[in-house]
């Protein structure tokens, strides 16, 4: 029996490249190099509220629209997808090798 070599990730590589390109061009806005005075004032006010003794986990809600939270979620999704692809590949190869050797 000849071994058939296939490229299992041939379709995934262009999709990952497009996703990375979209992320780098779409998430980073061109004109947002520095915050305005109103944004800086609201940031200072938010920091004062965050560090006050009345702020605890019950009263402070994290924002899912910040760059850091979006980046963390995308990283989490990427790690989950990469782990799933790796585990499928390893399990499939082990399964095929077990079938061929027995």
UniProtKB/Swiss-Prot annotation:
Residues 91-102 are intravirion. Residues 33-69 are virion surface. The chain crosses the membrane at residues 70-90. It is a single-pass type I membrane protein. Residues 1-32 form the signal peptide. Its main location: virion. Keywords: Disulfide bond, Host Golgi apparatus, Host membrane, Membrane, Signal, Transmembrane, Transmembrane helix, Viral envelope protein, Virion. GO terms for cellular component: host cell Golgi apparatus; host cell membrane; membrane; viral envelope; virion membrane. O-glycosylated. Contains alpha 2,6-sialic acid residues. Pfam families: Herpes_UL73. It comes from the Viruses. It is found in: Virion membrane; Host membrane; Host Golgi apparatus, Host trans-Golgi network. Interacts (via N-terminus) with gM (via N-terminus). The gM-gN heterodimer forms the gCII complex. Belongs to the herpesviridae glycoprotein N family. Envelope glycoprotein necessary for proper maturation of gM and modulation of its membrane fusion activity. Also plays a critical role in virion morphogenesis. This is Envelope glycoprotein N. It comes from Epstein-Barr virus (strain B95-8) (HHV-4).
